[in-house]
């Protein structure tokens, strides 16, 4: 039985029209997204967060380790946390950074109660900077209620380290189980362990995009933005690690101080990736709002 040629032609034209409409909307969305990136000056914001992170990272780690000390087998968790963090978030330089950061955090943990309070304040400085920049990207002009602010800061300082500790416990249990069932794991799910750093990055960024902005963010948008940021983060980690291993000249120029510019560049790249994901998430929300309210132009601050 032959089909009507006119019907086939109509179906073909309909598919072609849908494809053209999809390409047109994708191009408009990309243009709107990059206009927002340029207008919000994301490279400048990433530089600011990298500088604040350099000042606050040791106090923040001291607070994180103090929270993790509530868990049993703290020494094991701390070693696993340091190994995971520096091997996955500071590529190709984890040995030197692990030694120096362990020394810094150990010295910071010996401070008095006043010194500990100052460490908490410095850690809050980083969280406040993240809060300010995220709300700038989401165009939030209103002030957050103090109870919500305390809740958000408590989640970042308390819940996140506990989640990381729990994930490390889970990964250690999986690794122990994998040693006893090596053939089964290698045939079925050996790659799941390799996905663990990516999944942890995805979960942390998803929580950041959902909790920090002083505005309602849909889970779908936050998940898409976090997925993009986590993928870019893995690509940046591999690329930066390859560059340091094969083309980096920092050691020959800076010598023993080579770790400082390397850390600064890596912090800058990491925050740029996180901010790009946040901008993408915010763009999804505003793009959907503009489609709902037809005829409304995208609003840029200023």
UniProtKB/Swiss-Prot annotation:
Protein keywords: Cell inner membrane, Cell membrane, Membrane, Transmembrane, Transmembrane helix
UniProt cross-references to Pfam families, sorted A to Z: Virul_fac_BrkB
Transmembrane regions: 51-71, 111-131, 150-170, 188-208, 222-242, 256-276
Localisation: Cell inner membrane
GO cellular component: plasma membrane
Tagged with keyword Iron: no
Domain of life: Bacteria
Membrane topology according to the record: Multi-pass membrane protein
Keyword Transmembrane: yes
Family: Belongs to the UPF0761 family.
HAMAP family the record matches: UPF0761 (MF_00672)
UniProt name for this protein: UPF0761 membrane protein Tola_0461
Organism of derivation: Tolumonas auensis (strain DSM 9187 / NBRC 110442 / TA 4)
